[in-house]
Amino acid sequence: VEGVKRGEFMITFTYIISDANGLHARNALQVARAAEGYQCRIQVSSGGKTANGKQVLSLIGLSARKGAELLFSMDGEDEAEAAAYLQALVKEVI
């Protein structure tokens, strides 16, 4: 995981997938459930596709495999809290 970067209107961080199965139903569900707990907008991008971080099927639609880079972007009033929590979570589940 690269460090959290704070832009003018959002916070972003990147993560390289280490799970042998990539981003799949189980870990996508864990990310989406965690993301739903925050008010800010959360997007995840990989391979030229962008997903709503709060929607499991949207995340699975990224078709991200082991070694792929995920870019997480949070924008809203609780973006810092969301970024900190999600950054720790992805290290454990993806």
Regions found by a protein language model. Give the residues of each.
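C-terminal structural segments of small proteins and small subunits
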Residues: 61-94
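Short, Lys/Arg-enriched N-terminal segments with co-localized hydrophobic residues
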Residues: 1-9
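Solvent-exposed beta-strand sheet faces enriched in polar/charged residues
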Residues: 16, 45, 73-75
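Short amphipathic
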Residues: 10-19
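Broad gene-expression machinery/nucleic-acid interaction feature
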Residues: 12, 39, 69
